């Protein structure tokens, strides 16, 4: 039993609802001009740190075109080589590219960003993501499968 399962059993003895990720969150789609981001607010897969260690400043930032906008509280996951376990809970607004999944919560009154980050930074999630990835040399996570990942949704005070 995982630590999360132990806590849920202790704090929610009557059980909790389990839903697919897509029921509580979605991928960011809004685009912004690349000129709106800089080294501290642009997040590419190369500056997400392995083993759930957050991010570092970008060494290169797109000079032209559009990037996918993310907001403070979004969860960014590296979609290339999911076994590297690259994930970050955004502490600012910024932009990213298609190699990073920017997950936005649909309703902050149902799921807190910190709780969702905790669930998605679990070894169970990364094993699921790696199992559903495609490709041999540079596997990519399956965006559809990620949204089908089953997560617990305890009451907000428990989260």
Which role fits each region the language model picked out?
Residues 3, 7-32, 156:
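Non-catalytic DNA-recognition/assembly elements of restriction-modification systems
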Residues 34-42, 131-132:
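Short coil/turn segments at secondary-structure boundaries
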Residues 4-5, 29-33, 50-51, 111, ...:
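Short loop/beta submotifs within extracellular cysteine-rich repeat domains
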Residues 66-68, 72-123, 140:
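A short beta-sheet element
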Residues 24-32, 41-72, 91:
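Sequence-specific dsDNA recognition surfaces
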Residues 80, 95-101, 134-157:
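A short glycine-rich beta-alpha junction/loop motif
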């Amino acid at each position: 039993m995982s630590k999360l399962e132990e806590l849920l059993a202790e704090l929610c003895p009557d059980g909790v609802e389990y839903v697919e990720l897509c029921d509580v969150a979605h991928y960011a789609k809004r685009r912004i001009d690349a000129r709106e981001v800089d080294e501290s607010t642009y997040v590419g897969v190369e500056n997400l740190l392995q083993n759930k260690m957050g991010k570092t400043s970008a060494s290169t930032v797109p000079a032209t075109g559009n990037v996918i906008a993310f907001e403070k509280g979004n969860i960014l996951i590296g979609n290339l080589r999911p076994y590297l376990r690259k994930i970050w809970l955004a502490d600012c607004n910024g932009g990213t590219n298609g190699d990073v999944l920017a997950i936005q919560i649909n309703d902050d009154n149902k799921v807190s960003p910190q709780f969702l980050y905790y669930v998605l930074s679990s070894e169970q999630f990364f094993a699921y993501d790696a199992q559903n990835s495609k490709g041999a040399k540079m596997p990519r996570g399956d965006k559809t499968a990620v949204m089908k990942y089953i997560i617990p949704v305890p009451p907000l005070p428990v989260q």
